[in-house]
């Protein structure tokens, strides 16, 4: 007898049919993590963006990550690097060249989301940036990233920030 998933259906099982599958938010978080690593690799090694993306597709399991979002981040940050760095500069006490490379990658990714992904709420962008800095940055790097993003968000998303603070 041929078995398929419908054979396992149990109407008393409270779990949704897609239980165990990552949510959209979880897939985006994984895409941000992989993109942070890829942006760092690009910054340090200087390999081409297409080579890095191809390597990441081979070396990583994208089952739990949003591959199109990973692609958008990687290419979006690269394409808009001048605008991103210009947006970050007034919020920094250091020059771009003086920043920790990992924290710079995280802040560039977050700035890209604030500038070009208005579908992602600014509070989510800040929180995700902080979490990335906690995982990949220096011991207190997340505090620095938080401070910069807290200054950057109102500059780039003034109406959204004001609406939230009411």
From Swiss-Prot:
Keywords: RNA-binding, Transcription, Transcription antitermination, Transcription regulation. GO terms for cellular component: cytosol. SUPFAM superfamilies: NusB-like. Transmembrane segments: none annotated. It comes from the Bacteria. GO terms for biological process: DNA-templated transcription termination; transcription antitermination. PANTHER family: ANTITERMINATION NUSB DOMAIN-CONTAINING PROTEIN (PTHR11078:SF3), N UTILIZATION SUBSTANCE PROTEIN B-RELATED (PTHR11078). This is Transcription antitermination protein NusB. The lineage of its organism: Bacteria, Pseudomonadati, Pseudomonadota, Gammaproteobacteria, Pseudomonadales.
């Amino acid at each position: 007898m041929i078995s398929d998933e419908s054979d396992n259906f149990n109407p008393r099982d409270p779990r949704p049919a897609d239980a165990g599958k990552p949510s959209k938010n979880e897939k985006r978080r994984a895409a941000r993590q992989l993109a942070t690593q890829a942006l760092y690799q690009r910054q340090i090694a200087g390999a081409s963006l297409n080579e890095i993306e191809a390597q990441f597709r081979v070396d990583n399991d994208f089952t739990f990550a949003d591959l199109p979002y990973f692609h958008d981040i990687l290419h979006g940050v690269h394409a808009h690097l001048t605008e991103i760095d210009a947006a970050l500069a007034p919020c920094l006490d250091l020059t771009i060249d003086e920043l920790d490379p990992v924290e710079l990658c995280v802040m560039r990714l977050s700035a890209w989301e604030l500038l070009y992904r208005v579908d992602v709420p600014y509070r989510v962008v800040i929180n995700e940036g902080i979490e990335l800095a906690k995982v990949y940055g220096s011991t207190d790097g997340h505090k620095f990233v938080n401070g910069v993003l807290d200054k950057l968000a109102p500059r780039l998303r003034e109406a959204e920030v004001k609406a939230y603070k009411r």
